[in-house]
Amino acid sequence: SSKVIHLHGELTKVRPEDSYTEADVYDESRVKDIGYSAIGIGNVDERGVQYRPHIVFFGEAVPKLSDALRELVEADIMIIVGTSLVVQPAASLWQFTPVDCPVYVVDPEDTPIDREESVIHIKDKATTGVARAIEMLKKENIKQKNR
């Protein structure tokens, strides 16, 4: 994809606990990629501020929400991975895609949008379900080229 938005952050990154502004937007320049290294109490930045996972916890604002909305209104394909599609505001984002945009949901459990016509639900875990979604997209692309 040309635009992948990690709506709830990334577990391979950390940021200082004080990195949010009053507008609930984090300072991207203070985000640090740590790969799969552990982070714990005492892991601090150069100012002595404790690092925390670069993810959105329950009750926190979703800083990438407006970015996601801007991209979704022009999306050709949407792939949603590993979510119950119950918690708002993220649960409603798929509704902002164009009418002809296929929405793939990769999650082993049922979701509230399974019966929607544009939704293709791949009931599988992310590690294998995303690969299945890609294969389905490749086949669909071949069909469209042969028309």
Regions found by a protein language model. Name each.
Residues S1-R147:
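Conserved catalytic alpha/beta core of Sir2/sirtuin-type deacylases, generalized to analogous enzyme cores
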